[in-house]
C-alpha cells in the first residue's frame, strides 16, 4: 500500500494538516503524528501495544522505543505520517516512497534529512519528493529563494548529484532526470 510522509516545522501545522486530511475522508487510524513529544493519546496507545508485542526483545530506552513503535505502526497500519523535524532524523522509512515538504526549512540539509528518511538502503521504489510553496506568501518565496541560492552553492562545490536539488529546482526528481538522459 502507498505510504506518504509529510514534514512540517511546527506541531500546530501538523495538527492542522491532520484535521484537513480527516475532512477529506481519512480515518484517525490512517493518520499518524510524530513530533518527538510522544504526548498524544494515540501515540501512547501505539507504544503500549508495541511494548506488549516486543516484551523482552529490546531495551533501547524510551525515546528510541517510541520511534520503533511509531515506525512499526506506520509500516503496518497508517497511510500518512505527519512529522515535525523531530522525525527528520532517526527514522527508517524505506517502505515509504513519497515525501511531502509542507513547508520549507531555511537549512537545505534539513530537506536532505527529510528525504533521507525514505531514500535509504532497502528502498524498492523511486522516492518522490514534493515541495509545497505558496507563491502568494512573501515569506515562503523568500525561504525558497534562499534555499535555491544555497543549493546553487552546493552544486558548485559538490556537483549536482542531489535528490533534493532536482526536486527543488524543477519539481522533477533527480532520478527521473537521469533516466531521461
What would you call each of these model-derived segments?
Residues 125-181:
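C-terminal accessory region of SF2 helicases/translocases
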Residues 28-84:
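Conserved helicase ATPase core of P-loop NTP-dependent helicases/translocases
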Residues 15-20, 43-45, 94-95, 112, ...:
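A short acidic (Asp/Glu
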Residues 26, 117-127, 156:
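Arginine/glycine-rich "motif VI" loop of SF2 helicases in the C-terminal RecA-like domain
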Residues 91-104, 128-131:
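A short beta-strand element within the Helicase C-terminal
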Residues 2-10:
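Conserved RecA-like ASCE P-loop NTPase motor core of nucleic-acid helicases/translocases
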Residues 68-71, 82-96, 115-123:
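SF2 helicase motor core recognition
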Residues 11-13, 38-40, 87-89, 105-108, ...:
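Conserved nucleotide-binding/hydrolysis micro-motifs of P-loop NTPases
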Amino acid at each position: 500500500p502507498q505510504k506518504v510522509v509529510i514534514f512540517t516545522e511546527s506541531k500546530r501545522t501538523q495538527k492542522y494538516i491532520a484535521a484537513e486530511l480527516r475532512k477529506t475522508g481519512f480515518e484517525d487510524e490512517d493518520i499518524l503524528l510524530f513530533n518527538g513529544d510522544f504526548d498524544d493519546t494515540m501515540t501512547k496507545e501505539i507504544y503500549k501495544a508495541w511494548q506488549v508485542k516486543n516484551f523482552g526483545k529490546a531495551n533501547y530506552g524510551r525515546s528510541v522505543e517510541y520511534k520503533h513503535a511509531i515506525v512499526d505502526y506506520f509500516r503496518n497500519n497508517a497511510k500518512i505520517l505527519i512529522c515535525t523535524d523531530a522525525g527528520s532524523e532517526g527514522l527508517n522509512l524505506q517502505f515509504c516512497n513519497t515525501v511531502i515538504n509542507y513547508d520549507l526549512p531555511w537549512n537545505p540539509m534539513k530537506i536532505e534529512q527529510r528525504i533521507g528518511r525514505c531514500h535509504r538502503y532497502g528502498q524498492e521504489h523511486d522516492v518522490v519528493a514534493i515541495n509545497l510553496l505558496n507563491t502568494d506568501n512573501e515569506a515562503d518565496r523568500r525561504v525558497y529563494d534562499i534555499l535555491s541560492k544555497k543549493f546553487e552553492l552546493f552544486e558548485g562545490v559538490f556537483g549536482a548529484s542531489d535528490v533534493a536539488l532536482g526536486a527543488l529546482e524543477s519539481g522533477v526528481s533527480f532520478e527521473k532526470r537521469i533516466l531521461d538522459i
